[in-house]
Amino acid sequence: MSGFSTARQNMVDCQVRPSDVTDLRIVDAMLAVPREVFVPERQRALAYLDLDVEVSEGGSARRFLIKPAVIAKMLQAAEIKDTDSVLVAGCATGYAAVLAARLAGRVTATEVDPSLAAKAREVFVQLGLERVTVRAADPAEGDPANAPYDVIVLDGATEITPDRLYGQLKEGGRLVGVFAMTQPPRAMIVTHSHGDFGSRALFDASAPVLPGLERRPVFVF
């Protein structure tokens, strides 16, 4: 077993499974998808650690792969079916989008940094994926042209209510992400039911805030 293969197994055994991830589809996906290919060469030694790993290289916004256990638990909570259409908002280099593609019927990913969106496309081709596409777009804007979606995954945190994304959920659709407007920050699931949006806390979590979903500064005079 290669060094990265061993690290991948250890990530699943020591981070993912102990975090109550019992969906074997997600476990199998995390064992199969090489997380290191989504990380710059200089950062690859960090790829499988319990860290938010920075993948941006000089762009206007710092971008990260969020902690493995956090994305695994959010995907499990979303209960993605093989017929579902999924939007991954703020995909960085595409790791969460690839995991989702192993669960869903169709995946669209958005990324604000064009160079990272291009990197994600390269990795998708490298891995032979045909059911996932990426667009260079603000995570907060979503993908209204192809909405509605069964599932929306925030590949990071939000400090504001992502109303535009709520509006892109199908009836019965689910949005999962880290909501940093609560203290402590928590992963949440929001469900669209009969025109209403109900939320439920999943677990305490932290993640870097996605571009466009930052809290607006308040000026006091």
Task: Walk through the language-model features, giving the residues of each.
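Conserved nucleotide-cofactor-binding alpha/beta core module
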Residues: 79-198
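Class I SAM-dependent transferase core
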Residues: 1-87, 95-99, 103, 116-126, ...
